[in-house]
Amino acid sequence: MAATELRGVVGPGPAAIAAPGGGGAGPPVVGGGGGGRGDAGPGSGAASGTVAAAAAGGQGPGAGGVAAAAGPAPTPPAGGSGSSGTGGSGSAREGWLFKWTNYIKGYQRRWFVLSNGLLSYYRSKAEMRHTCRGTINLATANITVEDSCNFIISNGGAQTYHLKASSEVERQRWVTALELAKAKAVKMLAESDESGDEESVSQTDKTELQNTLRTLSSKVEDLSTCNDLIAKHGTALQRSLSELESLKLPAESNEKIKQVNERATLFRITSNAMINACRDFLVLAQTHSKKWQKSLQYERDQRIRLEETLEQLAKQHNHLERAFRGATVLPAHTSGSAGSGKDQCCSGKGDMSDEDDENEFFDAPEIITMPENLGHKRTGSNISGASSDISLDEQYKHQLEETKKEKRTRIPYKPNYSLNLWSIMKNCIGKELSKIPMPVNFNEPLSMLQRLTEDLEYHELLDRAAKCENSLEQLCYVAAFTVSSYSTTVFRTSKPFNPLLGETFELDRLEENGYRSLCEQVSHHPPAAAHHAESKNGWTLRQEIKITSKFRGKYLSIMPLGTIHCIFHATGHHYTWKKVTTTVHNIIVGKLWIDQSGEIDIVNHKTGDKCNLKFVPYSYFSRDVARKVTGEVTDPSGKVHFALLGTWDEKMDCFKVQPVSGENGGDARQRGHEAEESRVMLWKRNPLPKNAENMYYFSELALTLNAWEGGTAPTDSRLRPDQRLMENGRWDEANAEKQRLEEKQRLSRKKREAEAMKATEDGTPYDPYKALWFERKKDPVTKELTHIYRGEYWECKEKQDWNSCPDIF
C-alpha cells in the first residue's frame, strides 16, 4: 500500500499514531483535531491517542491527542452589568440586564438567557440550575424600543418585561438577537398559515415523515459502509506492516520496524473498538427502525379506520336528519325573519334545528354537492338561469362605474361549487385555523379588515351617545353598539380573507354619515389588524384585534384578542371593552349555526361607570330566548341604574331600575324591578337586502365594502385580485391567484428573516417590520402595547402620494 494511501487510512501521518507516553497524566482526549483525510473518519489520531492512553495504564493522550488539545478551549465571555454574551448549552444569548420590578425597588439586575425562542431570567447566574423567575415565549411577543437603553417585551398583557441595558450598543445587540430568535420561533410555531407560508398540513406531515425515514435509512447505510471500510483498511495496514517486517534490513532498522508494528497494533485496537461500536449502533438502529416502522404503520391504519368510521357516522347523521324532517309536520322556523323575543322563545330549539332546510354539511365518498333550495348554505346557493340578467363581466364593469354617492345594492350571486370537504377538514382538528391554507370555497369576498369595519354599521348609536349628558345613559348606547356588531354574524358562516401584511382598507363616509375609517394589517405572526375611525359627530373608535381560532372537530372556536376604545370628544369619556368568543357549530355534520358566548365589561375610565354584558350560550335544553344578552349599568359604587335585555341578532332594550324600599326604609334588593313603562329600545337590526341568501347574507353596508373606489391606497383590500375574482364567481382563478399572493408574501418574509440574520451576524442594527399608518406604543389608559393611528393617511390620499406603500398584490 502506498504511503499516501496509508496516511489516508490512518490519519495525518506518523504523529497521529505516535507511541504512548509522550503526554503527561491527564484525561484522555475523546475528540478534537488531527482528523484523518481519508475514509477513516474524523480524527483517527485522536482516537489512537485515546486507546494508547488506556493501554498504557491511564497515561496522557498520545501525540495526536496532544495535538488536538493543544489549543486553548474557547470560553464564552461573561456578561457584566448590563452586558451580554453568547452563552453555552445551546443558548443564543445570555447576560445581565436591568429589569423593572416595582416603584419601590425600581430596576434590578437580573441574569437573562435567550434560548430556543424563550427569554428567561434569574436573579443570578447560579440560579439557572434550580429557579427560573420568569419566561416569555418570543413567538407571540412584541419587542419595542423605548429609548437608547430601554426596551419592552410583551405578549399582549399577561407578561410584560421593561428592560434596560448598560449602553445603546448592548441594547441593540439584545434587540437584534431577540428579533432573530422571534423570527425563528415563529417559523417553527407556524409552519403553515392561510396567507401562504407553507403547504397544507397533510402534505407537510407526509413530506416530513418521508424525509425522516430517508435520513435514517441513509445514516444506517453510512454506518454499514464505515464498518466495512474500517475492517478493510485495518486488515490492509496489518498486512503491509507484516510484509515490511519480513524484509532483510540493517539491524538498526529492526528496532524502528518493531516500533511501527507496535503502533499498528494500537491502531488495530482502535479500529476494533470503532468496528464494535459501529456494529452495535448498526444493530440498535436497525432494531429501532423496524419498531418505528411497525408503530408508524399501526398509527396509519388506526387513522384510516377512524376516518372511515367518522365518514360513516356523518352519513348516518345526515340520513337521520332527513328522516326527522320527513316525519315532522311542523313548519320550519326561519331565523332570518325578524321576530319578537316572545316568538324566538317559543321556537326554542327550532331556531337551531330547523332554520335552514336542506343545509347539509356532511362528507360524501367523492364530493359534496350543495342542495338547490335557497337557505343558509355553506358553499353557496344555486343560481338559476333567470336569476341574473347580466354576466359576471358586465356586473364587474358596472360596479367599477359606480360612484361614491350611488352605493351598490347587489353583488354577483354566489356560485354552486362542489368541494371535497372532508379531505381538508380532517387535518385541521386541534389546529390554529388561520395557519392552514384553505381554498376560497370557504371564504366570503371580504377581508378581515372589511369585516372589522362592519362594526360601524350602527354608528348612529355612537352619534346618539355623544349627545347624552348623563354618562350612565351614554354607557347604555355604547353597550348597544357593542352588541350590534354581532348582528350580522348569525348568518355569516363563511370566513373572511386573511389580510396580507401591510394590507389596508379605508371607508370614507364623512359626507354621508359623518365618519371615516382606516384598517391596516400590522402583524402577520400573530395576525393582527389595527382599526381607527373618527366622526365629526364627536367620537373616535380604535382597536387592535388578533384573531385566534381552533378547530375541535365538531365546532370551531374563534377568540378575538385585543381591547376596543371609544372616546367622546366633548366629555372626554373613554370606554374600553373586549369581544366575546364566537363558536361555529356542526362543522362536519349537520347544519352550520353560530353562537356568541361570554361576558363583556365596558368601563368608563373617566367616571368609573361600568356595564357588564352576558352573552348566554345556546342550549338545546334551555327554554330561554335564543341568543339572549343581559346587562347591568352600574355607577362607581356598584349601584345598578339600568338593566339591558335583548338578543345579539335582533335588538336591545333598556330599563331604568326602580329600587324597592324594604321594611327599614332601605333597598330591599339592589336591582329592584324592571318597570315596563321605562323600556326604551336602544337598537334594532336592519333587515337584510333582498336575495341576501344568494349574496353571502351580506348586509347593506357589507355589499358596498368591496365596491371599487378610485384614489385608494394601492394596498387597499378592494384591489386584492383573488378576492375580486372570487366575488365575480371565478373561484378557480381566485384559488390560483391566492397561491401567487401566498408565494409572494412567503418570499418577502424569508427576505426579512435573512436580513435579520445577517444583521445579527454582522452586529449591525436591524429595523423590524413596522406598520405604515399605525405606531406601536403604550396605551395611556390600559397601559397595553397597541397600535395607534399615527395620522397622514388622509393627507396622502388627498395628494395621491402613495410612494411609501409596499407592493403586496
Swiss-Prot record:
So where does a 1,2-diacyl-sn-glycero-3-phospho-(1D-myo-inositol 4-phosphate) get bound? L119, S120, Y121, Y122, R123, S124, K495, P496, F497, N498, H524, H525
Q: Transport: is it a keyword of this entry?
A: yes
Q: Gene name?
A: OSBP
Q: Family per UniProt?
A: Belongs to the OSBP family.
Pfam families according to UniProt: Oxysterol_BP, PH
- Top-level taxon of origin: Eukaryota
Comp. bias regions, Gly residues:
20-46, 79-90
Q: How does it assemble?
A: Homodimer or homotrimer. Interacts (via FFAT motif) with VAPA. Interacts (via C-terminus) with RELCH (via the third HEAT repeat). Found in a complex composed of RELCH, OSBP1 and RAB11A.
- Membrane topology listed for this record: Peripheral membrane protein
Annotated positions binding 25-hydroxycholesterol: Q316
Where are the annotated segments for Disordered? Answer: 17-49, 63-91, 332-355, 729-761
Q: What is this protein called?
A: Oxysterol-binding protein 1
The UniProt record lists the keyword Transport:
yes
Which residues of this UniProt protein bind 7beta-hydroxycholesterol?
Q316
Q: Where is this motif: FFAT?
A: 360-366
Describe the function of this protein: Lipid transporter involved in lipid countertransport between the Golgi complex and membranes of the endoplasmic reticulum: specifically exchanges sterol with phosphatidylinositol 4-phosphate (PI4P), delivering sterol to the Golgi in exchange for PI4P, which is degraded by the SAC1/SACM1L phosphatase in the endoplasmic reticulum. Binds cholesterol and a range of oxysterols including 25-hydroxycholesterol. Cholesterol binding promotes the formation of a complex with PP2A and a tyrosine phosphatase which dephosphorylates ERK1/2, whereas 25-hydroxycholesterol causes its disassembly.
Chain residues that bind cholesterol = Q316
- Please give the residue positions where the record annotates the modification Phosphothreonine: T379
Q: What GO MF annotations does this protein's record show? A: cholesterol binding; phosphatidylinositol-4-phosphate binding; sterol transfer activity
Q: What InterPro entries does UniProt report for this protein, alphabetically? A: OSBP_sf, Oxysterol-bd, Oxysterol-bd_CS, PH-like_dom_sf, PH_domain
The protein's organism comes out as Oryctolagus cuniculus
Domains as described in the record: The PH and the Ala/Gly-rich domains control cholesterol binding without affecting 25-hydroxycholesterol binding.
Q: What is the effect of changing Y298S?
A: No effect on cholesterol and 25-hydroxycholesterol binding
